[in-house]
Structures are given as C-alpha cells and as structure tokens.
C-alpha cells in the first residue's frame, strides 16, 4: 500500500470512529425519549374522605415524571366524582372540542365548556355542542384511603381518545 492510499484509509477509519462516538449517544437519547414519552406516573391527589360523594369537585395537584433525561413537575387539575369511598371517576379538565377548560354548573347538573357551548352530562357524555366525544377519563386508583391519578393529555378535536 502506498503512502497516499494508507492516509486515505486512515482518514476514512477516523471519520467512521468519530461518527460512531458522536452518533451513538445521540441515537440513544432519541430512542430513550421515544420509549418514555407518554408514560405518566401515578400522582397523589388527596384523601378520599375529604371528597363529597356524587358531586363533581375540581382538585388541583402536583404531578411529576421523567421524560428522557429531564424531570418535570406540573400543576394539574382534574374533576373527581366519588361514587363511594372506594370508587371514583376522574375526568381530564380539558374539553374534547378545542381544549378549553370546562366547569361544573351545579344549578343545571352538568359540565359546560365556556368556549363553544359544549355541554356534558355527569357521566361525561355529550349532551349537545360541537365536542366530538365524551369527556376523557383518567386512570385512577384508591390505596389506603388516598386517590391517585395517572395524569395524561389527549388530542382534542377528534372522535377517538388518543394520548399525546
């Protein structure tokens, strides 16, 4: 092998090694982000004995999780309906139409979205308005008298419930 050929080979090998050294951590980060995206952690919402039975209550709580290498902490809210001390329905506070936060109208016994007048029954079904689907429920569990919620975000404006 001549000197010029050897130098071309050496430079090519160094370029490949450099590409691997720089590329593998980058690809690992991308794969790690894709693998952990959308996985919510269980967040403590509060004691169930402080929640009234059969009446929707909006509760704010701190949720946290890790996405890729970043730890995040968010202030979230949910609507909770306690059916018994061991059974609850938890709704995302976001209207399924365009993402506005809805409220509970105690006088009429229904959830109402102030943005485009979507109205939902106590069980989350659409009574009228442009909302394409019922209210989104969140996974919930009760352990030792404490309610935990797996907070998720959903795509709005579509007939199917899709976690984003």
Where are the language model's segments positioned?
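Beta-strand-rich cores of mature extracytoplasmic or soluble domains
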Residues: 106-110, 122-125, 129, 143, ...
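N-terminal pre-ligand scaffold of iron-sulfur
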Residues: 8, 12, 18, 25-96, ...
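Short cysteine/histidine-rich metal-coordination sites, predominantly Zn2+-binding motifs
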Residues: 109-117, 127-136
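Twin-arginine (Tat) signal peptide motif
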Residues: 1-7
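Flexible, glycine-rich terminal cap/loop adjacent to redox cofactors
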Residues: 100, 117-120
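Short Pro/Gly-enriched beta-strand edge/turn motifs at strand-loop
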Residues: 59-64, 119-125
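Short alpha-helical basic/polar micro-motif
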Residues: 4, 93, 122
